[in-house]
Amino acid sequence: MSGFSSEERAAPFTLEYRVFLKNEKGQYISPFHDVPIYADKDVFHMVVEVPRWSNAKMEIATKDPLNPIKQDVKKGKLRYVANLFPYKGYIWNYGAIPQTWEDPGHSDKHTGCCGDNDPIDVCEIGSKVCARGEIIRVKVLGILAMIDEGETDWKVIAINVDDPDAANYKDISDVERLKPGYLEATVDWFRRYKVPDGKPENEFAFNAEFKNKDFAVDIIKSTHDYWKALVTKKTDGKGISCMNTTVSESPFKCDPDAAKAIVDALPPPCESACSLPTDVDKWFHQQKN
C-alpha cells in the first residue's frame, strides 16, 4: 500500500470537481510537490490522472493551491478526449511523475523546444485499470518525445510494479516484444488525438522513435532538477502554485492546518456524479495520411 488516499470534492464531470490527495496521517498534500519522485531504488511514483478507457481529460491543477486533480476546461467547456477509431478514450492509465516539471524557460537539447510547464507525463501499460487520484509505483521502460504546438511534451512509458507481468519488462524493447502494436498505437494516438477538435496532428522528435529506459530516466532526472529550482524559488513559476507541506527547503511550505483550510473552503464531497455527455461515446473516423 502506498499510504496515500484521495478525497473528491463536488461532483465528477462538473467545473467544481476536484480530487485532493492525503498522506498516511490523513493530512492534505500536493500530488505535484509532496509525493516523492522515488518510491524505491529505480522505482518511481505515478499520480494517476486518467484511468484507461476513460475520456474526461483530468490533470493536476498546477496553478491551484495544493494542486488537486480537476477536469481541463477550454473556452468554458469541460474537455473530453475523442474516441478516434479504433481507440476508446485513453489507451493506458495516464498521469504524471510527481516532483518533476518541464520548464517552459528551458529549450530541450534533444527537441529544440521549451517544456510544456507541467509535470512529466506517464503512460502506464499494465493490465489493471487504475483509479483517478491513485498513487502507484512504476518501473520506467522508455520515453517518447512529442512536440505539442511547439512545446516539448515527453511521454514516459512505464508499468505498475504490482502488475503480474512487471518482472518481464526491463526496457522498451520488451514492450515491443510482449505487447506487439502497442507502441505504434501509442504514437498514432498522440499524433491524432486532437484532430477531432480541429487541431493539426502532433509531431515528434527522433522520427517518433521511442528511447530506452536509461534515456528516459535521464530525462526524468532533469525534470526533477527543474522542479527543485521551481519549488525553492530559484526559477519563477509564473503562476504555478508551489504550496507544499513537506519540502523543507521551500519557502512555499505550509503547515497541515493551512492546507486543510484550502480544502474546507470548497464544496463538500458529492455522492452522485453528473452524467457524461452522450457525445463522449461518439466514434471519430479519420483518413490517415
Swiss-Prot record:
Q: Output the Gene Ontology cellular-component terms.
A: cytoplasm
The EC number of this protein is 3.6.1.1
Q: Which GO terms describe its biological process?
A: phosphate-containing compound metabolic process
- Please give the Gene3D superfamilies that the UniProt record associates with this protein: Inorganic pyrophosphatase
Keyword set includes Protein biosynthesis: no
Cofactor(s) the protein requires to work:
Mg(2+)
* Binding sites annotated in the UniProt record for Mg(2+) 2: D121
This protein's source sits in the domain of life called Eukaryota
Q: Which GO terms describe its molecular function?
A: inorganic diphosphate phosphatase activity; magnesium ion binding; pyrophosphatase activity
Q: Matching CDD domains, A to Z? A: pyrophosphatase (cd00412)
Q: Which UniProt keywords apply?
A: Acetylation, Cytoplasm, Hydrolase, Magnesium, Metal-binding, Phosphoprotein
Catalytic activity field: diphosphate + H2O = 2 phosphate + H(+)
Task: Give the UniProt subcellular location, in the record's own words.
Answer: Cytoplasm
Tell me which residues bind Mg(2+) 1: D116, D121, D153
For the modification N-acetylserine, the affected residues are S2
Protein family? Belongs to the PPase family.
Complex formation: Homodimer.
Protein known as: Inorganic pyrophosphatase
Native species of this protein? Mus musculus (Mouse)
Q: What is the lineage of its organism?
A: Eukaryota, Metazoa, Chordata, Craniata, Vertebrata
